[in-house]
Protein backbone atom coordinates (compact mmCIF):
# COMPACT_ATOMS: atom_id res chain seq x y z
CA UNK A 1 0.00 0.00 0.00
CA UNK A 2 1.51 3.31 -1.06
CA UNK A 3 1.12 5.93 1.66
CA UNK A 4 2.28 8.93 -0.35
CA UNK A 5 1.72 10.30 -3.86
CA UNK A 6 5.15 9.07 -4.99
CA UNK A 7 3.79 6.52 -7.45
CA UNK A 8 1.62 9.10 -9.17
CA UNK A 9 4.53 11.55 -9.27
CA UNK A 10 6.75 8.87 -10.84
CA UNK A 11 4.03 7.79 -13.27
CA UNK A 12 4.29 4.22 -11.96
CA UNK A 13 1.11 2.16 -11.58
CA UNK A 14 2.75 -0.27 -9.14
CA UNK A 15 5.89 -0.64 -7.05
CA UNK A 16 7.64 -3.21 -4.88
CA UNK A 17 8.61 -2.34 -1.33
CA UNK A 18 12.34 -2.98 -0.94
CA UNK A 19 12.79 -1.92 2.65
CA UNK A 20 11.44 -0.25 5.73
CA UNK A 21 13.26 2.70 7.27
CA UNK A 22 14.54 2.48 10.81
CA UNK A 23 13.27 4.94 13.36
CA UNK A 24 14.05 6.64 16.60
CA UNK A 25 11.02 7.58 18.64
CA UNK A 26 10.75 10.08 21.42
CA UNK A 27 7.19 9.60 22.67
CA UNK A 28 7.41 12.41 25.21
CA UNK A 29 9.80 15.32 24.99
CA UNK A 30 9.17 17.94 27.65
CA UNK A 31 10.47 21.46 27.32
CA UNK A 32 10.66 23.19 30.66
CA UNK A 33 10.39 26.96 30.84
CA UNK A 34 8.79 29.07 33.52
CA UNK A 35 5.11 29.86 34.06
CA UNK A 36 4.49 33.59 34.06
CA UNK A 37 1.73 36.17 33.81
CA UNK A 38 0.83 37.53 30.39
CA UNK A 39 2.07 40.98 31.46
CA UNK A 40 5.69 39.85 31.87
CA UNK A 41 7.92 41.63 29.33
CA UNK A 42 9.36 39.43 26.58
CA UNK A 43 12.96 39.76 27.76
CA UNK A 44 12.07 38.04 31.05
CA UNK A 45 9.93 35.24 29.64
CA UNK A 46 10.96 31.59 29.49
CA UNK A 47 8.12 30.54 27.19
CA UNK A 48 8.18 26.77 26.71
CA UNK A 49 5.65 26.89 23.84
CA UNK A 50 7.85 29.24 21.82
CA UNK A 51 10.81 26.94 22.50
CA UNK A 52 8.71 24.05 21.16
CA UNK A 53 7.90 26.06 18.04
CA UNK A 54 11.60 26.86 17.58
CA UNK A 55 12.43 23.15 17.86
CA UNK A 56 9.78 22.21 15.29
CA UNK A 57 11.11 24.79 12.83
CA UNK A 58 14.70 23.64 13.39
CA UNK A 59 13.64 20.04 12.69
CA UNK A 60 12.00 21.14 9.46
CA UNK A 61 15.23 22.88 8.40
CA UNK A 62 17.20 19.72 9.27
CA UNK A 63 14.81 17.64 7.15
CA UNK A 64 15.13 20.01 4.18
CA UNK A 65 18.94 19.93 4.45
CA UNK A 66 18.99 16.13 4.55
CA UNK A 67 16.74 15.80 1.52
CA UNK A 68 18.71 18.46 -0.41
CA UNK A 69 21.84 16.37 0.26
CA UNK A 70 20.14 13.29 -1.21
CA UNK A 71 19.53 11.61 2.14
CA UNK A 72 15.82 10.77 2.40
CA UNK A 73 14.36 10.80 5.88
CA UNK A 74 11.13 11.59 7.68
CA UNK A 75 10.41 13.71 10.72
CA UNK A 76 6.99 13.56 12.36
CA UNK A 77 5.79 15.50 15.36
CA UNK A 78 2.67 13.65 16.47
CA UNK A 79 1.78 15.52 19.65
CA UNK A 80 2.53 19.21 20.21
CA UNK A 81 0.91 20.90 23.19
CA UNK A 82 1.04 22.79 26.45
CA UNK A 83 -0.08 20.90 29.54
CA UNK A 84 -3.88 20.75 29.78
CA UNK A 85 -3.91 21.28 33.53
CA UNK A 86 -2.01 24.56 33.01
CA UNK A 87 -3.97 25.94 30.02
CA UNK A 88 -4.98 29.56 30.45
CA UNK A 89 -5.33 32.48 28.11
CA UNK A 90 -3.20 34.75 30.29
CA UNK A 91 -0.39 32.40 31.35
CA UNK A 92 2.97 32.17 29.61
CA UNK A 93 3.41 28.37 29.41
CA UNK A 94 6.18 26.98 31.56
CA UNK A 95 5.93 23.42 30.17
CA UNK A 96 5.45 22.09 26.68
CA UNK A 97 5.38 18.54 25.35
CA UNK A 98 5.79 16.94 21.96
CA UNK A 99 6.43 13.55 20.43
CA UNK A 100 8.96 12.94 17.69
CA UNK A 101 9.55 10.13 15.21
CA UNK A 102 12.71 10.32 13.07
CA UNK A 103 13.18 7.85 10.21
CA UNK A 104 16.04 7.07 7.86
CA UNK A 105 17.14 4.16 5.70
CA UNK A 106 20.60 3.62 7.19
CA UNK A 107 21.45 3.04 10.85
CA UNK A 108 24.43 5.39 10.65
CA UNK A 109 22.29 8.13 9.16
CA UNK A 110 19.72 7.66 11.91
CA UNK A 111 22.45 7.98 14.57
CA UNK A 112 23.68 11.16 12.88
CA UNK A 113 20.15 12.58 12.94
CA UNK A 114 19.88 11.82 16.63
CA UNK A 115 23.15 13.68 17.25
CA UNK A 116 21.88 16.64 15.26
CA UNK A 117 18.65 16.61 17.26
CA UNK A 118 20.63 16.89 20.49
CA UNK A 119 22.58 19.79 19.00
CA UNK A 120 19.46 21.87 18.34
Predicted stretch roles:
Residues 1-108:
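Midchain, well-structured core segments that form catalytic/ion-binding scaffolds
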Residues 112-120:
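Short amphipathic alpha-helices in soluble, non-transmembrane regions
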